[in-house]
């Protein structure tokens, strides 16, 4: 809905290989959510480790930069850090930190260390074994990283192309948008791990196997 953000998304999807007609459709979907967004007028900025009414603030970057969970008496208010039946989207966006998937995997480690007895998430039912769910999500991303490596070869692929290899052909624009972002976060994690290479071809970012 924000014109400046929409322009950044257009440039972002073009940078990662989406054709212009597809880019317009992908970005157009973002305006759908605008009526549902309400911003806090005077936000209180807080950091991990601080207390808010007796709740400990726990860093949980990955799904969103700067995301914080609340922990008290074994109860974790988990926002979208942990979900019971689906996996939170962990994507690379124009304003993202450089390694959102690495951030997310580290946050899942932290969840296991804290070992809360229950987690209340932003979607779905309460999670009665948060540490176990964190391990399941780590395994999901380990397998997705393996898929990403297997999908890469000597021929350069864009994030847009990679999203078809990882998520298939039959996606609506809103799902394709997230699929591209997720493909990029996994590709960048592999680049940082030395298992893939990032290149550029005519102003478009590409990835190959290392």
Describe the function of each predicted region:
Residues 16, 111, 166-169:
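Alpha-helix boundary/capping residues
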Residues 147-210:
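C-terminal regulatory/interaction regions
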Residues 2-32, 36:
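Extended, charge-rich helix/loop segments that form flexible
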Residues 52, 70, 196-198:
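A structural signal for short hydrophobic beta-strand segments in well-ordered beta-sheet cores
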Residues 45-54:
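Cytochrome P450 C-terminal beta-domain/meander region
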Residues 47, 61, 208:
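Residue-level detector of conserved, well-ordered beta-strand and adjacent loop positions
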Residues 22-43, 56-145:
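Metallo-beta-lactamase
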Residues 52-53, 113-114, 155:
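Glycine-rich phosphate-binding loop signature in dinucleotide/nucleotide-binding domains
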């Amino acid at each position: 809905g924000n014109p400046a953000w929409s322009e950044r998304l257009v440039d972002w999807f073009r940078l990662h290989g989406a054709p212009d007609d597809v880019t317009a459709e992908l970005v157009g979907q973002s305006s759908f959510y605008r009526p549902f967004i309400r911003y806090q007028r005077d936000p209180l900025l807080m950091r991990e480790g601080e207390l808010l009414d007796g709740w400990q603030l726990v860093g949980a970057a990955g799904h969103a930069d700067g995301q914080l969970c609340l922990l008290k008496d074994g109860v974790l208010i988990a926002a979208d850090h942990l979900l019971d039946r689906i996996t939170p989207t962990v994507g690379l966006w124009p304003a993202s930190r450089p390694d959102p998937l690495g951030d997310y995997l580290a946050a899942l480690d932290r969840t296991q260390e804290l070992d809360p007895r229950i987690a209340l998430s932003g979607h779905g039912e309460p999670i009665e074994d948060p540490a176990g769910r964190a391990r399941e999500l780590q395994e999901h991303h380990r397998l997705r990283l393996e898929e990403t490596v297997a999908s890469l070869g000597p021929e350069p692929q864009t994030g847009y192309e990679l999203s078809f290899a990882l998520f298939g052909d039959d996606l609506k624009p809103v799902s394709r948008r997230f699929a591209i972002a997720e493909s990029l976060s996994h590709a960048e994690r592999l680049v940082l791990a030395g298992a893939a290479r990032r290149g550029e071809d005519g102003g478009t970012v590409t990835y190959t196997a290392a």
